Each structure stands twice: as structure tokens, then as C-alpha cells.
A protein has these predicted regions:
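Surface segments flanking catalytic/ligand-binding clefts of nucleic-acid enzymes
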Residues: 53, 73-79, 244-400
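Intrinsic disorder/low-structure terminal segments
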Residues: 4-7, 13, 301, 329-331
Length: 400
């Protein structure tokens, strides 16, 4: 794990695009001057595997906890010159030149996250509708089509096409009171596996295995860990109530991805990708937990366990993260866990307090992390170090 700390080491500064870009630049291997367009395909190791997680799939099978996109091609409106009034009155929302969608119903109460999600899906469909050649969706776009969340709230649309391609800008979107900035339509070059693209909802999309390597090699560190953790969770069909089998499946998936990566030779981003694949954990159940995993791994000198089971008075509790030797637990307070209405929130809150009391009575220290704290990883790391230092009565030295 020490090697992971060396790769993911960050200065104590807020996580923003510039600092992350600098970090990623430092993490790139010395051969970054080589062309990224070189195609290198490797067959992922699947022989004799008891679990089909790494075998190429076809069709529209749902994987693990994935959810398909809500929008379909039928939601698109092709603009033919007679929609000016509808655009001006915001009945239609332009998502790409010549393509719009109908304004969502009850848009005045539309949550911010749903507005961004709708725009991201509409942009993918609009690109597919208007491209005059075969297009395969990759990276964050592939994740959304597979039904897996990505960290970027407003992701670029990533595609792979044969021949040359000039990146372009997809316009900003105004949806009710939400202003969604413009994003790039960009092309990736080459593939890293022999898995064939899949067709999901009429869209050609990279396999999850290909997407995992694309994200591990090319995405920013935080985005990469979140993406690969989600993909490994889906491929291994992780179930915390069946952990021995789930962990074996997780190891198979990871081994296949690492074998594929190591067979690629010397390529930019390989050091980061190996660290990402090693760190990523199928036991993270939500995108918030995946982000917290990254924060913990880049600051803690201890081995972190996910979904650690603790039995108290015949009750089993699964801790999001734990340092068992110190009896320290880290719990992420996500929105989904707390329910969607007042009554369910109150029930969840009472259960949370009861759970915390039982854990503390059993000698555990529970450190809670809220969603808002993930927005400033430097401050979150400082908090985590401070709390753990108090528990150990000694300062914690973050690995260099």
C-alpha cells in the first residue's frame, strides 16, 4: 500500500481542477511524450474463471447495480426551423445544434442533480443521432450508458470514431433555474482490450472492462478511483452479505484488469492506472463512499477495510470503512441512506443513533463524513488525521 501513497500523494490544498491536473501530470510516467494514439489490444485473462465478470458480453444485460439511462431516442426533438417559439419560451431545450428535448415536467422543482443528469444523457443521445459515421461511446459517457455514476457532475461526451476527428463544444443548457455549462465533445484513440463494444439502448458503448482501463489510465486520480471501484463492484456483483464469494470475484476481476494493463507495455499513465486498480474496492456501495476511499487512502498509513462486519448482541453491523486494529470506523452519511421523505428520514436517523451508540459501547470510535466534506479533500484529510491522532494519542504521519 505504501506505493499507492506515493502515487496519490497530494499537497494540503483544496481539490480543484488545476491542482488535480498538476498531480496527474506528476503521476504520469516518464514516457508521456509518446503518442497516446497507439492502439494496443490485450485479451483479458478469463480462462478457467468461475465468475464471468471479465468475459466479453453482448446484448443489453444489466450488470450488478447498474441502472440504464432514463432518456431514450424518442425524447429527442430534431429542430427543423419551426421551433423558434418553443425554444424562446423554454418549452424546448437545445442540447446540440439541431437537437432539443422537451422541458421536464414540474421543472420549477427539478433538483439540481437531476437537471445535470438529464443534460448529460440528452447530449449523448444527440451526438449519437447526428453523427454520420459509426461512433462508440467511451469513458464517462460509457459509464452513464452502463448505468454507473461518475464523479464529474457535467461530464464531457467521449466517443471513439475511425479516422480524424475535430473536438467541438456542446452548448450550455438552461433547465429551469439551473445553468449547465457547455462541455466538449472529444474523441479517444485506441483500445486496451479485445472486448467488443456492446449495444445498449441502441448505443454502441465500450465494455466495462475497456472503460475501467480507459478511466484508470486517462482520468484524474479521484475520478479514476471512483469509476474503477464502481465498475469492479458491478463486474463482481459484490454483495456484503456474501463477502467471501464476493471478494473472490473481486480478486478475479482485478487480476484480469491488472494482467491486461501490464501487458500493454510502456504507455502514459500506467503507474497511475496500476495504483488505481490496486486501490479500487468493490465494497464501496455509493459514489460518496468511493470518494471517501480515495481520501482515506491518500492520507492514512493504516490498512483500510471496507464493509467490515461487527457483531454486537447478535446484530451485524457493516462499517463503511474500518481500521480494525484501532477499532476506528469511518461512516459516510449519504442522502440515500437517510431516506427520501420526512418519516423515512426520522426512522433512519433514529436507527443511525442507535447503531452509533452500540458501536461506541463496544469500544469503537465512529468518525462520520458528510457529502459536503467531500468537496474539499484537503480539509477532509486534515479532519481525518486529527481525529485518528486523538484516538491513538500520537500524531499520525501520512506516508510520503
Amino acid at each position: 500500500r505504501k506505493g499507492l501513497f506515493q502515487v496519490f500523494r497530494q499537497k494540503p490544498a483544496s481539490y480543484d481542477r488545476n491542482r488535480t491536473a498538476n498531480l496527474e501530470s506528476r503521476m504520469r510516467t516518464a514516457d508521456t511524450n509518446r503518442s497516446c494514439g497507439q492502439k494496443s489490444t490485450v485479451r483479458l485473462r478469463t480462462e478457467g474463471h468461475p465468475h464471468p465478470g471479465l468475459r466479453p458480453r453482448s446484448g443489453e444485460e444489466r450488470i450488478g447495480d447498474s441502472r440504464p439511462m432514463k432518456m431514450t431516442h424518442s425524447d429527442l426533438v430534431m429542430l427543423r426551423g419551426n421551433h423558434k417559439h418553443a425554444i424562446a419560451s423554454h418549452e424546448l431545450i437545445r442540447v446540440k445544434r439541431g437537437v432539443a428535448i422537451a422541458a421536464p415536467k414540474q421543472s420549477e422543482t427539478l433538483p439540481r442533480w437531476e437537471a445535470f443528469s438529464t443534460a448529460a444523457e440528452a447530449r449523448i443521445l444527440a451526438v449519437a443521432r447526428t453523427m454520420r459515421r459509426k461512433v462508440v461511446f467511451t469513458r464517462e459517457s460509457a459509464m452513464l450508458i452502463h448505468g454507473l455514476p461518475c464523479w464529474a457532475q457535467n461530464p464531457c461526451v467521449s466517443i471513439r470514431v475511425a479516422g480524424s476527428f475535430t473536438p467541438s463544444l456542446l452548448p450550455g443548457v438552461i433547465m429551469s433555474t439551473h445553468q449547465i455549462p457547455a462541455v466538449r465533445l472529444r474523441s479517444t484513440h485506441g483500445t486496451y482490450t479485445e472486448a467488443q463494444p456492446q449495444r445498449i439502448g441502441g448505443l454502441l458503448v465500450d465494455s466495462l472492462e475497456e472503460t475501467a482501463l480507459q478511466m484508470a489510465l486517462k482520468a484524474r486520480p479521484l475520478d479514476a478511483v471512483i469509476a474503477v471501484s464502481g465498475i469492479i463492484k458491478a463486474l463482481s456483483r459484490f454483495d456484503r452479505f456474501r463477502q467471501p464469494a464476493s471478494r473472490r470475484h473481486e480478486e478475479i476481476v482485478k487480476a484480469g484488469l491488472l494482467d491486461g494493463l501490464r501487458g500493454l507495455g510502456s504507455i502514459p499513465g500506467k503507474r497511475q492506472a496500476e495504483a488505481v486498480l490496486t486501490l479500487s474496492d468493490a465494497g464501496c456501495e455509493t459514489i460518496g463512499e468511493q470518494a471517501l476511499l480515495f481520501a482515506l487512502a491518500t492520507v492514512m498509513p493504516y490498512e483500510i477495510h471496507t464493509q467490515h462486519e461487527v457483531v454486537i448482541r447478535e446484530h451485524s453491523y457493516f462499517l463503511d470503512f474500518a481500521i480494525p486494529s484501532l477499532k476506528i470506523a469511518f461512516e459516510f452519511d449519504g442522502f440515500i441512506k437517510m431516506g427520501e421523505d420526512h418519516d423515512s428520514f426520522q426512522r433512519a436517523h433514529r436507527a443511525l443513533l442507535s447503531r452509533q451508540r452500540e458501536l461506541e459501547d463496544a469500544g469503537w470510535t465512529v468518525i462520520r463524513v458528510a457529502w459536503e466534506e467531500l468537496m474539499d479533500l484537503a480539509a477532509l484529510r486534515a479532519k481525518l488525521l486529527g481525529r485518528v491522532s486523538k484516538c491513538t494519542s500520537a500524531p499520525i504521519v501520512s506516508p510520503a
